[in-house]
A protein has these predicted regions:
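Active-site SXXK
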Residues: 66-91, 115
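Bacterial N-terminal signal peptides that target proteins for export
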Residues: 1-7
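Beta-lactamase-like hydrolase cores
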Residues: 19-65
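Extracytoplasmic
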Residues: 38-40, 62-64, 68-73, 89, ...
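Mid-domain, small-residue-enriched loop/turn segments at the edges of structured enzyme/sensor domains
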Residues: 104, 111-112, 126-167
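Active-site-proximal loop and beta-strand segments within enzyme catalytic domains
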Residues: 83-110
Length: 167
């Protein structure tokens, strides 16, 4: 089961990297959605129903820039943690360490489901310690995830470290 998830995840990340810049069609009219939400952003949509595939993009420059994956990293990180044995399954209870944090949802025992819902950093920091940097680097390379660099001098490497992915 986990092998199929790995293959699907790897295919998703690799396919998102392989997009050729020259084949992109700019969609400036999509800016209204970001403006209405009061945010900066980019979107890349690949329509593979066509042959060859059509790639539509709003803000091509931003789409090419690399960013910290932040909370989006929970998805591959959860799979790495399961594969490494840091957590058994989505039902395992991860005991709260008792440290009061700003967000109330973090101040309780967690499962994978609640940790993902609340973006519970202490859970994922625990996984990172258990996995270790060398194994994390190997996992990242195995799915061709961004620059595959989990090094950090402070904090969570997917937030404050060197790990970068394209928008």
């Amino acid at each position: 089961m986990i092998e199929r998830v790995w293959v699907a995840l790897a295919a998703f990340f690799i396919s998102s990297i392989v997009i050729a810049r020259d084949s992109m069609i700019d969609k400036p009219e999509w800016s209204k959605h970001f403006t209405q939400a009061g945010v900066n952003g980019t979107i890349v949509v690949v329509d593979e129903r066509k042959t060859p595939a059509i790639t539509l993009v709003f803000d091509r420059e931003r789409a090419a820039r690399r960013y910290s994956p932040a909370s989006t990293y929970k998805i591959p990180h959860t799979l790495f943690a399961q594969d490494a044995g840091a957590v058994a399954d989505e039902f395992q209870v991860l005991k709260w360490d008792g440290v009061k944090r700003t967000f109330a949802g973090h101040n309780q025992d967690q499962t994978l489901r609640s940790a993902m819902r609340y973006s519970t950093l202490w859970v994922y920091e625990g996984f990172a310690r258990q996995i270790g940097e060398p194994k994390a680097r190997a996992y990242l390379r195995s799915i061709d995830y961004g620059n595959a660099d989990p090094a950090t001098s402070k904090g969570a490497y997917w937030v404050d470290g060197n790990l970068r992915i394209s928008a």
